[in-house]
């Protein structure tokens, strides 16, 4: 349920919707906050604080080499954190998972889309996977998933944190940067965003 608040067109749609929402309300639209809103306010499923916190703090856009859970005491503190994020979206960077499961969820979010976006870009004929530089985590989706998971297990098993080693973390950051330059900022993608996604969000 962590991405249940995502609008159409993933993060691109989210950015355009955020601009419109902020212009009209003074608050921000962020998919992780919307996921919490859906599961806690719109449909009150009586979900635990730890689960809602994991959903709010799952955003893989903010990668770390080590994830230490930080205890969250009550719903009042949690609601205050969420409201602060609506007012200033930079506060999302302060959200930290309160459990190891939440930490796993956050790093898994990055692992899930890093190679999959490359796979999708190749299917859409935007570019070939061999356009990427070889690195410690590989270049193909299956390689990236396997190499990162194995490294995280090796560095985290039996520990009170979730961690990958420095080599794999640097490779992850490089791969993510390559995705931005080669996929998300690609002229074809930008043109479709400008001509299709933005007008649809305005409707």
Model-flagged regions — what are they?
Residues 1-32:
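Aspartate-rich (DDxxD/NDxxD/DxxxD) Mg2+/diphosphate-binding motifs
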